[in-house]
Regions:
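Charged/polar low-complexity intrinsically disordered regions
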Residues: 195-198
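Long, acidic (Asp/Glu-rich), low-complexity accessory segments flanking structured domains
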Residues: 2-108, 114-191, 203-357
Length: 357
């Protein structure tokens, strides 16, 4: 009897081990170590083309740059078309995907930045990761941050973008505590983006008209709230580039609140009201919502704006779902990638009324 029990336990153990091994190999095929990922975007062409050929997305023919007379409100009074992990087309990251989201009229681009060893040197790169320790990538490749910035400066203010005169917000989630990375990121901003860089800080009173045709750098302070301490240049290092000299806004701050989709949906509804002038609202700060990384569904823009007054709702452009289509319809119907919050509330209130009939 004892031998039968031992045999049974042994069989169960072997089966369980095989299941775990199979799950591990599946994940390993998808998630690879930072130092072993391919540089560049070999294999991404078909992914980007598939996304570009999606006939369900509204034409961007109506989208245009915001007119100066409509841009005189503070930043918090505008909804901005935003993409999440803007270089990601699914399994790959590429400069072609950056060009695509810009061609759709997105003016808030989001990137995860890592610092990895390349040959004998370290360099900042763009990839996608859900690893809390930032040791593994979800994408099968990475691209140098330099390549991403070059794609941005070459496409954001050219005919590629239907709203090329709008300000462009670059949201950098820098996932390292290495001082050298912040120095390298700052150096790339200085050498590539500087001609279009906004001068001075941006706060809750800064008007969009003051940022037209400019790049605004946004650093995610929630990754490392003390990032300024270890990113600070030493007095004797004259060749160091301090990230604080290139940062206009911080997400996770009082000026730009940063929330995950799950955080928002766990809160009670808190609608923003349109004031009696029919132009401004009761919004006190700009709010940014990022989708859940491991969730395939995009946020519901109607709910985000009407129930919570979220101005910047970032979308996964590699997830071609109905919610992305609704986001595209909204910005296309309102003829811009930057739309007054009051207009957005009115637009979705009308849709909400029609849905209840």
């Amino acid at each position: 009897m004892n031998y039968l029990n031992i045999l049974l336990y042994l069989t169960i153990f072997i089966l369980f081990s095989m299941i775990l091994c199979n799950l591990y190999m599946k994940n390993k095929a998808k998630i690879v170590s930072l130092e072993n990922t391919q540089e560049g975007f070999t294999g991404s062409d078909s992914e980007v083309k598939s996304i570009e050929n999606n006939k369900n997305l509204a034409s961007v023919g109506n989208i245009q740059s915001i007119g100066k007379k409509y841009a005189d409100l503070p930043l918090k009074e505008y909804c901005i078309k935003a993409s999440y992990n803007s270089a990601c087309s699914g399994n790959y990251v590429s400069k072609d995907m950056i060009r695509h989201v810009l061609s759709r009229g997105c003016r808030f681009l989001d990137f995860e930045v890592f610092y990895i060893k390349h040959k004998n040197n370290f360099m900042p790169v763009v990839a996608k990761s859900t690893d809390p320790k930032f040791v593994l990538f979800d994408t099968d490749n990475h691209i140098p941050l330099e390549e991403a910035f070059t794609s941005i400066i070459g496409n954001a203010f050219s005919g590629t973008s239907p709203n090329k005169n709008d300000p462009l917000f670059l949201h950098l989630r820098i996932k390292t505590k290495k001082t050298e990375c912040y120095n390298e990121v700052s150096k790339l901003i200085d050498s590539i983006l500087k001609p279009k860089l906004m001068e001075g800080e941006v706060n809750e009173e800064t008007k969009v008209s003051e940022m037209l045709n400019k790049i605004v750098i946004v650093i995610d302070k929630t990754v490392h709230r003390d990032y300024k301490d270890f990113a600070k240049c030493k007095a004797q290092d004259v060749n160091c580039y301090d990230i604080s000299n290139y940062t206009h806004l911080e997400s996770g701050s009082q000026v730009l609140n940063k929330l995950t989709l799950s955080q928002v949906e766990n809160q009670p509804s808190n609608p923003i009201m349109i004031k009696d002038d029919n132009v401004s609202t009761t919004a006190e700060a700009s709010k940014l919502v990022l989708p859940i990384s491991k969730n395939t569904q995009n946020p519901k823009i109607q709910k985000m704006i009407l129930s919570y007054g979220i101005q910047i709702v970032a979308y996964k452009y590699d997830e071609q779902d109905k919610e992305l289509e609704k986001c595209e319809d909204f910005f296309n119907d309102n003829k811009g990638g930057i739309v007054p919050l009051a207009s957005a509330i009115t637009y979705f209130e009308r849709i909400d009324t029609e849905q209840k009939k």
